Amino acid sequence: MRKTIAYYHLPGLFEFYELYEAFLPIYREHREYFYDWCGIGSIYGAPADCIWGGGRIGSGEHGVQEVMNLMSEYGISARLTFSNSLLREEHLADEKCNALCKALNDSEGSSNGVIVHSDILARYIKKHYPNLYLVSSTTKVLTDFNDFLNEVKREDFQYVVPDFRLNKVFDKLVKLTDKEKDKVEFLCNECCWFGCYDRKNCYEIVSRQNLGEDCPDHVCVAPDSQSGYRFSKAMENPVFISVGDIRNTYMPMGFSNFKIEGRGLGSALVLEFLLYYMIKPEYQIHVREDIYLDNMLDIF
């Protein structure tokens, strides 16, 4: 069934609090700036020092109540990125991570969720925080379509984020049922090398670091890794999902959930993601001016 609204799942629940504090009033007060076919499905992230964290190292100085007040004010679902792949039973007693889950579980308004990798954690959250929905993390690196399909069929998960390399296997995606399509959340702006063979190891090192293990940072194996993340480079990825792709291919096919990555990047770049995916081109300058751009700003 063709979808009429695309929902974006945005990075930086804690990491980019100040950005959303400035952006969300514009989202509410100037809907004419925004494409009329899109909305915010959730904002995801984790603060620093969360042993359940994964994907990226969390950051941000704002407390959970402050963050949840902002999300509640705008009726937006909050998601904790707790996608550590190496959790053991003894880690489940962590006070900070449990307190965060309790805050989201007890929050009134929009339902909130947790992005998970570990089945141990998934079972624990279902038992102790039943109001939270679960999202299967892309850190599972499910590159085989049948493995991904089995994940989609699991009743535990409200959403499943496939590996980005499955973004455009349209001959298989089109065969999903409407219920299955509603669960799929595509990662749009991945800059990782399409041929990467070390992605799972990259995520595992982050999991170890979040657990406090002393291990070196992952060394990226991409041919051009020295340039870091560039949005222009991500756009050249063969499985990059553009605004046109969303409107002309995915929504007509029945898909409506799209994840924007960027927790480990700078807020200026995340703003560019928001502008590209949500704001009509003629209004992008207005949003920049509302947030940071004035007639006295120097860059040199």
Residue ranges and their predicted role:
Residues 1-151, 157-300:
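Active-site pocket-lining/capping segments in soluble small-molecule metabolic enzymes
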